[in-house]
Structures are given as structure tokens and as C-alpha cells.
Amino acid sequence: MSTNKFVVRITNALFKSSLASNSPPVYPKRIRHFEILPNEKWVIWGPGKGKFLDVLNNKYICEPPLSLRFGFLKESSNILPRIEQVAFKGVMPTAHLSARYEYFKDDYDQTCKQFIFDKASGSNAVSYKVETNNRQINMELYNALVENLNLSSLQDRWVMGLSNGQMRRARLARSILKEPDLLLIDDPFLGLDPAAIATISQFLAKYDSIEVSGGCPIVIGLRYQDTIPAWCTHICCVDEKNGILFEGPIEKLQSKMDETRSRALKELEQLKKASNSKEDISINDLICIHPMYGKKEHEIIKMPHLIELDGLSVSYKGEAVLENLHWKVQPGSKWHIRGDNGSGKSTLLSLLTAEHPQSWNSRVIDNGVPRRTGKTNYFDLNSKIGMSSPELHAIFLKNAGGRLNIRESVATGYHEASSNNYLPIWKRLDKNSQEIVNMYLKYFGLDKDADSVLFEQLSVSDQKLVLFVRSLIKMPQILILDEAFSGMEVEPMMRCHEFLEEWPGTVLVVAHVAEETPKCAHYLRLISPGEYEIGDMEN
């Protein structure tokens, strides 16, 4: 790679999504010059990072045709560039939420090793696999990847059993094992705990020095609020509407970066003040119909615990995940559920929503009543729960993203039975329920294009916002927010956090980044099976 003069070069280019004459350009102005050289480590920074990574991935049509060039291709080559783009949106796709926890029953599951190889598919019920390509696997590189990404002990684990952080590392290994010419990674640290962030960051910092890989240039995408790793050498600040604002060596642009970040925060505060001054729908207007609204402390303490775990233990094939867990949740309380990736947080939440095969356990007590097979109804339990999570996001996008608009997407939150129901319901709602949807859309700034924009056409941030509003709409007793704000822009996230401070129901939050964590009064920290901490937050 070092013999090439450049990796990627853009010269006086205009990018479009199609050849149609009326197709609008991705950015209104031409990109005069942008270049990545060997040994440079770039971060694409700001709200336009996703589009720009797509530009580098050759996903758009460039005018003139040779205005986007790749230095690792020969001038006369007809071979397309080998570019791997890794976007972390949810976990391994599954047909329904409970499949995430029924992985040991899935006839078409793969081990972590098979997933990283990405060569075959087949059933666990038979002894053979169907080869999907004839690509030769570089086993030296594979061994180096699993060692450096801490995947050695996970090679034989089923993919559906991996935590979000483990799955993130496996996806990274899968892409790099294809030995691409260029690796693009959007939000590499999103939703990860500090230990997982350190593992991936250290790996990316030294990747080009792993001898068996041969190395390839890596470009990452980060938001304004993200910490830029010290190993990044260059930055390209991209606005979603105007394209490149500035680019070059980080050491020469630090003051400009500080100014841009500061200006973005000031604009955010101004938007917030303007919004508050003009607001004709208050938070009280939105929450006054919640069953817990207006409840006094002396009334709440007389109620049974909404959730009680009385020495709960859960294991997979003899391996403990949760052990002897005692936890009580009072109605209306707000909890931050903490723990490293793989500590059992997702398992705990799946038990509460009855998506886990071991949910029917008398040591799980709902409103003072122990769960028992045949006595406790899955649909009754979920009628009281609202949820937003990476798993739900991935499944909603796949199953409903191309057919439901914003208003219809939010309205599906009214389905009593489960958060996993995406069937259209808007036209069947009564006028009162429709008005509630409309009020929520207006308050959260989603009303303008609510009928004309499909869910899949939204940015990741707006998709997250729609799913958050969807989780509120049926006034659930329990609101589960599993990484609900990872990937959300600062302004809507702050609005959501402000709203949650007034929300009268019980809230269970999983978040690894302090800025993405709404205010909570208590915390449960899972450390290892049988070891945990419960305490009060210091807000």
C-alpha cells in the first residue's frame, strides 16, 4: 500500500443517487479536492458523516465519471474497489425479538467462527454446510484478529448468544478478514462500555502494524459529541446539507474543531429556548393520562413492587449468566442498569419482557404475583411495557421500514400485545388515540413530514426518536430504554431526557455513555454471575 501515491482522491466532483436528470445532488456544491494518503488515519466528523462515508464507498454516481478515484486500482483495471463499510445498527438480524434469546433453538444459527468466515450457511440439524462463496480464508489473519479483538474464547459460541459488544467485534473481524482495500466504520464505539471501547480503539490504532494483514486504510465516522481517538491523524468535518466544512491534519485544526463543537452546542441551546418559548403542548399535556400521573409518595409505598426478582438464576447450557439476583423495583422509579458488555443486561431485560425461554419462573414476581407457566400471560405482561432497543430497531427497519410512514410507525406503539407488533393500526385508532399520537409528533418535532416520509428514509437519529416516541404512546407502566439514545443527535436526545424527568412511570435504562443516560434515581450494576451492586444515583 505504501507504494501508492493516494488511497482515495476526489476532484471537482458532484455526487448523485441516480442518473435521472432531476435527481438532486447529495451535496449542493462540488467537492473541489479531498484526498486520503497511505498511513493517514481519518475521522469523518459531524452530522453529514454517514453520507460522506457512502461517497467513499462508491455508492453514488460521480460527475464527471473519473472525479472519484482509488489509488489501489490500476488505471486500466475494470475491477471494482474492495471496500468494506461497517455500520453497527442493531445486532444479528432475527425474525422476532425472542429469537435473540432462543439462539440455542435456531436451526440456522452459526457459531461466531462461522459468522466471521462468512462462507457458508446451513442447519445445525445436519452435519454439512452449504458453501456460499469460494473465497480462501487467510487463517493467519483470522488467528490474529480473534486474538487482538478478544474473540478467542467466543469462537464456538452461537452468534445469537453474543452481546452487542461481542457482536460488534465479530462484525469487525468479519469485514477485515475479507482483506479489503479500504475499511469504513461508522460509529465504531456507539453504545459500548469503556472496556469494549478501549479494545476496539487499541485494535484500530495498531491494525496496520499487524504483519499478517498487510494493513489497509481505515476511516471512522464520529459525531460532534464523541471523543476523537488520539491515533487519528486527519479530520474531515461534514455538514449534512453543505458537505465538507473543513479538512486536514487534526493538529492544525484543533481550534477550528473546538469552535465548531462550541457553536453546535450554542445553536442547540438556542433551539431549545426557542422551542420552549413557542411550545403550545406541555409535557403535562402528554403524560396526564398515565396511570401513575399525580400519585403521591404515600400512595406509591402502599403499592406492591412492580418488579421483584427473588434470588433469580439463569444459565445457558450450564454456564451461569445471572445468579441469585435479588432486586425490587418500586412503581414510578427510574433505574440505570449498568454492566460491561456480556454481563447479562440484555438477558435481564428479556426476562422482564418474557422474551426469554426461562422467563416463566416463580422467582420473577410481577405486581406481587409470582410468574408461573400457564398462569402468567405473555400478552398481559407486555401490555404494560414499552420498549426501544437495538434489536427492536433492526427488526422494525427490516419488517416495517419500507411500508410505514412516521405517523403509522409511532401509532404501532398502541398494540397492546407486544412491542414486536408492527402491523398498521393508525386507521383503526379512535379519535382520542389519534390526537395523542399527533400531540406527541408535534412535541418531538416529527409532525412536518409524518405522512410523507417512510421510516427507512429517516436518518438513524430520527429513527431512534420515532422508536422512543413509539415506546411511550400506550402509557406503559414499565418503559425499557436499551441504548435508546445511541446514535441520536444531541438536540432530540436532550428533549427526550427532559421529557423523561417528568415521566411518571417506571423507567429502566441501559446506556454506557454518560451523555446518553437520562437522569435516574437508582442503579443496578451487574458485575459477574452472583455479583452485583444496587444503589442510589448521585445526580
UniProtKB/Swiss-Prot annotation:
InterPro entries xrefs: AAA+_ATPase, ABC_transporter-like_ATP-bd, Molybdenum_import_ModC, P-loop_NTPase
Annotated binding of ATP, by residue: G339, D340, N341, G342, S343, G344, K345, S346
Keyword S-adenosyl-L-methionine in annotation: no
Keywords, comma-separated and alphabetical: ATP-binding, Mitochondrion, Nucleotide-binding, Repeat
Pfam families on file: ABC_tran
Annotated GO MF terms: ATP binding; ATP hydrolysis activity
Subcellular location: Mitochondrion
Primary location group: mitochondrion
Residue span, ABC transporter domain: 8-265, 307-537
Position of the signal peptide: none
Cellular component, GO, one term: mitochondrion
Stated induction or repression of this protein's expression: Induced by transcription factor YRM1.
Homology family: Belongs to the ABC transporter superfamily.
Miscellaneous notes: Present with 1580 molecules/cell in log phase SD medium.
Protein name: Uncharacterized ABC transporter ATP-binding protein YDR061W
